[in-house]
Regions:
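Short acidic/His/Gly/Ser-rich catalytic and metal-binding motifs that mark active-site loops
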Residues: 15-19, 117, 183-184
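A C-terminal junction/extension of Radical SAM enzymes
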Residues: 181-189
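Radical SAM/AdoMet-radical enzyme domain recognition
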Residues: 35-55, 63-181
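The substrate-binding groove and active-site-proximal loops of carbohydrate-active enzymes
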Residues: 26-29, 58, 119-122
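Short acidic donor-binding/metal-coordinating loop in glycosyltransferase active sites
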Residues: 9, 57-58
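Short coil/turn segments at secondary-structure boundaries
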Residues: 4, 58-62
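Canonical Radical SAM [4Fe-4S] cluster-binding loop centered on the CxxxCxxC motif
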Residues: 1-35
Length: 189
């Protein structure tokens, strides 16, 4: 039974992280996709708990108006849970953060750990991400979840990485690297 889908709202990102494998092919097909039609089908056929992730080939918050349209469309579907993962560099207004909270969106910030580790692959964005994490907490009263990409450096410093995340008291998903600096995609299967 299918219980989740991931939807990429775009193929654009405001960063160029050294380990990102989504843009290795050079040009990405940015053919239009009717996201609302996909959501219409999910609403019609998912008669059970269902997860929708707005993640993938780009930074979803670059298309925040489209994300808001999708969330409004799903307002009458309490069995559908929504999450998104952002690189954390797009500043959101208090109103936008409250909108995400009111629509029960689990917002995950991509954060690889302490500053030196994060900045090593994520374009020196640690300070900006942490400001947005703090703003999210100030508005919602809780920290977002985190998604950390695991590579050799984080494995060599795992205690430091874990110690970095512990004070937040929230869920951290550790994802392995695929592509240039991780295992080849062919070996992942």
């Amino acid at each position: 039974m299918i219980d989740r889908i991931c939807i990429s709202l775009n193929n654009r990102c405001n960063l160029n992280c050294s380990y990102c494998h989504f843009h290795e092919k050079g040009t990405m097909d940015d053919a239009p996709m009717d996201v609302l039609e996909i959501l219409r089908n999910v609403k019609e056929y998912a008669g059970h708990s269902f997860k929708i992730g707005f993640v993938g080939n780009g930074e979803p918050l670059l298309d925040f108006p489209m994300l808001k349209d999708c969330l409004r469309f799903l307002e009458d579907s309490p069995l559908i849970q929504v999450y998104t993962i952002t690189n954390g560099t797009i500043p959101l207004s208090d109103e936008d953060i409250r909108f995400l909270e009111q629509h029960r969106v689990n917002v995950g910030f991509s954060l690889d750990g302490y500053q030196e580790l994060h900045d090593q692959n994520r374009c020196n964005s640690f300070g900006q991400v942490m400001r947005n994490v703090q703003k999210y907490r100030d508005v919602t009263g809780h920290y977002p979840t985190f998604n950390a990409t695991v590579g050799e450096e984080s494995l060599l410093n795992r205690e430091r990485v874990i110690s970095f995340f512990e004070p937040f008291g929230t869920r951290v998903t550790f994802s392995r690297m695929i592509g240039k600096h991780g295992i080849p995609l062919e070996e992942y299967r």
